[in-house]
Design a protein with these regions (language model features):
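Short acidic-hydrophobic surface loop/beta-edge motif
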Residues: 51, 163, 282-287, 434-444
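C-terminal, surface-exposed recognition/capping segments
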Residues: 170, 299, 378-518
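Short, compositionally biased
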Residues: 124, 165-168, 175-396, 480, ...
Length: 518
């Protein structure tokens, strides 16, 4: 029996062949994706870095920063990528059976080893593989020492993702930041300029029964996306809807502030989202273990005594913010601060800051996110015609206004700030100079501005800091009959109480919100 002079491939070589073929599939997918779409997210996995593109393409690449030039790579010729024989410098192109260059846009080459020990390639399982030849036309021996890793690193920065190849080349793609990668919500925090995307197919976090909405939003003809208002001109731009993916894209510029972005159908609001542009909020663990955000929802900062610490106002159970402002208003000039402090999109004249003496439905509130509702006769000073105690809850709901990972707190979250309706020396302290309250636990201190509130009767801002001290009113998620509980504090008084977390009030008031961790 004649003996084959060529030994069979080792297990190590067979594994290299398998790894190389898997890498070639990934490389082809990447080469196509970077030219057609943006990177939506990056994630470290056990198998490598998973890149998700906005068109839905997902690729996982295994990287080796120390890897050298591989057996096969890619290079640009004209306006297209072609497969290369990386070991060859003068004639780098990997050739097909007819001797022509092989475009990356075509079939993926499948690499193997023939029974004589040479590298082979084919593009179809039904086609007999041919030997890979070097620049002199000689077959390339599969020694087992070849480098088969194709990716050196994946790095993101300045709005781009750079994928370094081991053959010295680079694939580059624009990157958008996926705001909903950690979960969907009615508010998203943005801390740097750039292009962003979020999932517009889900209302809020998609949870909570009895809130009056279906969690899912079905894309339909006539749908678009746009901004409705911003308190910093040019803060958001390029708002657009991809009806295929159901994603909303937007560009955030320099500065800090707030904006409301909406999914529209035939000029009417289907759902809206609060884009909150601020330094990345920090957290503080209170004495009872509740983890709070370090600022009011919608605030640009945390400066004691500074208006940057003022957040937005919210009617209880509604997800959409009402502009805060820095001055007290009267019923005659209610929302003057909002009109002077924000830019409203002129493309939608029916959508502007307004007060309505009539109650509405949850659908009506969602369709008119800039209208402050109150029916003081028919509903017990509620904005909702049929009061609903499930719109917010200690389990985050679809209508909760906080960003992913946060929710409106329960009233018990503030229990260690209070003793007998009074401040606690060294723990919760009224600051009469900066008009607000500090809460200290351990080495951390939180600032609560006395930001007042929007009155139920007109929507006017009242209770802001003044010579009489001002007051703070912060909603909780808990309810009492047709009212809801809130945290209230004011200048230190000898009687009648200075701070209380067990007061309940009509849900049509516009109070501030301090989000806590879910």
């Amino acid at each position: 029996m004649e003996t084959n002079p060529f030994p069979p491939p080792s297990a190590e070589l067979l594994q290299k062949i398998e790894d190389l073929n898997a890498g070639l599939v990934s490389l082809k997918t990447l080469a196509g994706a970077v030219s057609q779409s943006e990177v939506r997210s990056l994630a470290e996995t056990e198998d490598g870095v998973r890149l998700t593109f906005c068109d839905g393409t997902e690729v996982t690449v295994a990287c080796n920063a120390a890897a050298e030039a591989p057996l096969i790579g890619i290079a640009v010729d004209g306006d297209a990528y072609y497969w290369t024989l990386a070991a060859e410098k003068d004639i780098p192109w990997l050739k097909d059976a007819a001797g022509a260059k092989m475009p990356v846009s075509g079939p993926v080459p499948v690499v193997g080893r023939d029974d004589k020990g040479f590298w082979t390639v084919t593009t179809d399982a039904a086609v007999t593989p041919w030997q890979i030849e070097d620049g002199s036309g000689n077959p390339v021996e599969a020694t087992g020492d070849e480098q088969v890793e194709l990716f050196r690193s994946v790095k993101a920065g300045n709005g781009r993702v750079e994928i370094a190849l081991t053959d010295g080349g680079t694939l580059s793609a624009a990157q958008v930041n996926d705001l909903s990668v950690a979960g969907t919500a009615n508010c998203y925090v943005v801390s740097a300029p750039g292009t962003y995307v979020f999932n517009a197919r889900v209302r809020g976090n998609g949870a909570g029964e009895g809130v009056g909405f279906e969690p899912a939003i079905e894309m339909a003809d006539g749908m678009t996306a746009d901004w409705l208002w911003t308190d910093s001109e040019g803060l958001v731009s390029g708002v657009a809807l991809d009806t295929t993916s159901g994603d909303i894209f937007l560009t955030v510029g320099e500065g800090r502030g707030n904006a409301l972005v909406a999914l529209m159908q035939d000029g009417k609001v289907v759902w809206s989202w609060h884009v909150w542009v601020t330094d990345a909020p920090q957290t503080m663990t209170y004495g009872n273990g509740t983890v709070f955000m370090d600022r009011n929802l919608g605030a640009a900062g945390t400066t004691a005594g500074g208006t940057d610490a003022y957040g937005m106002y919210y009617q209880w159970g509604r997800k959409d913010p009402f502009y805060g402002g820095e001055k007290t208003e009267t019923s005659a000039n209610a929302f003057l601060e909002a009109k002077n402090g924000t830019v409203v999109n002129p493309a939608y004249p029916a959508l502007d800051w307004a007060f309505s003496k009539s109650a509405t439905t949850t659908d009506g509130a969602a369709a008119n996110p800039m209208t402050f509702y109150n029916d003081k006769v028919g509903t017990g000073y509620n904005w909702l015609a049929s009061p609903n105690a499930t719109l917010w809850g200690e389990a985050k709901t679809l209508n909760d206004p906080c960003p992913p990972g946060y929710r409106v707190p329960g009233t018990g979250a503030w229990e260690d700030l209070i003793s007998g309706r009074q401040y606690i020396d060294g723990v919760s302290v009224w600051d009469g100079t900066n008009y607000g309250m500090t809460y200290t636990h351990g080495e951390q201190t939180a600032w609560y501005p006395a930001q007042g509130y929007r009155n139920y009767s007109s929507g006017a801002i009242v209770g802001l800091r003044s010579s009489t001290g001002g007051s703070g009113a912060y909603w909780s998620a808990e309810t009492s009959s047709v009212k809801s509980y809130y945290l209230f504090f004011r200048s230190k008084l000898s009687s009648s109480g200075s701070i209380n977390n067990e007061l309940d009030m009509n849900r049509s008031y516009g109070y501030t919100v301090r989000c806590c961790k879910e």
